[in-house]
Amino acid sequence: DIYSINQASLKDASVHFNGGCSAELISDNGLLITNHHCGYDWIQEHSSVEHDYLKDGFWAMTIEEELPNKNIFVRFLVRMDDVTETVLKGYDPSMTESRRDSLIEANSAPLIEAASREGAGYSASVRPLYYGNQYFIWVYQTFTDVRLVGAPPSSIGKFGGDTDNWMWPRHTGDFSLFRIYADKDNNPAAYSEENVPYKPKKYFKLSIKERKEGDFTFVYGYPGRTQEYIHSEAVRYISDISNPHKRNLRTQRLNVQDKYMSQSQKVRIQYSSKNSGVSNAWKKWLGEMNGIIKLKTYEKKKSYEQAFQQWAADKPEYRDLIPQLDKLYEELEDYSFATDYYNESIRANEIIRFAENIGTAFSRNRGKDYLDQMIEAYFKDYFIPIDKESFHLLLAEYDKNVPQHLRPTYFAAQMNIFGTTDAWVEHIFATSALTTEEGTRTLLEKALSSENFQDVLLADPAFVFSNEFRQHYLDEINRPYTEINRQITLLYRTYMK
């Protein structure tokens, strides 16, 4: 009943909701329940000052009142199989890692192609477990017509807010309801008024029987990833360096957002989903830090590694693992720190991330229709004072905390021109076309009609800022960061045998 590929089982009633959450089917008409925070983006998307579903909740009284959503999907796990032997066929330990990767890709391709043809809406991926000691293929069926059915007011769905988030037990009505739709043959289909509620192979029947302390509980869904096996120095970096810095940066963003959201109902709706995303990781990182300290995780890791080192003293394959990991994590620290600040203080600025996304769309020849949709979606939920004030704070933090050798030369050049980060930010917002929808459309129309779109885009200071930091990150930070992590993965692969 738990997992079967030959008959309906619990796996057919549990779905992966939009790639990041679990959801469960609770009726024979495709009704599914997930967390309120998992459905929050679409509750916000449908909200307005006139119809504030975030504040008041939403309930579809009929099928016709259910709300279609953009950019949403649910995936059913069809099956998962151990394909280690097939994937590693032809592997020789003397191979380089790049040759091994090529072999794995070549051996995986036929498996993925065959599995993807097994049914409508099927897709497959081959993923490593235990740092490449084992490989599984996961086969999914994906549905994209998923409609909002109901959600409680945020006073219920987010009761306790950040104080209770990531804490247990807690008392909150953290749920929302959606319905999966399919074509007349019960297969995945793009949104259409002709689609009908999906008929699941299996669904969970809700019980209102009394529950007692100690009753058996079985949790079924799609959990996140574990870092259970990481090295002690990785734990130290997370608790002592990475999380404190990232939380500080997000605290400043949250303070700015909260200030303006409290002043305007429209801005509150615009930034509710963004604010939840920022605060969710902010609270998680606090819990990680406190948990590592409370449980003495670093000290326990160190003790275990010392015992491992004693055990490995007469085993050549394992003898140097811990010293090598110590050395590599020391080399990695600067690049990890620069990566954290690139993501949390540079790309965290909306205008800069918007510029990056536009540049990516142009480089992939997405076309005018795609760009029009991007512009419309961006400015629907954009409030310049929040972005500008946050940018001032985040760039100042970058200047204060990131060592010179980890910065792009562009940073020093601009500081020579403007003198302060505040003056630099003011210049960007005073001269960039990306601060208004009209200015953005004019700029992009010019770029679309130009023989060289990059020349047009790079005349705008927001694009220059985005491009310079991104190129520096890719060339000077991410390249060594990736290489060192590759070496760490190789050591973990041996460590986990």
What are these regions (language model features)?
Residues 1-497:
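Terminal presequence/propeptide segments associated with secretion/organelle targeting
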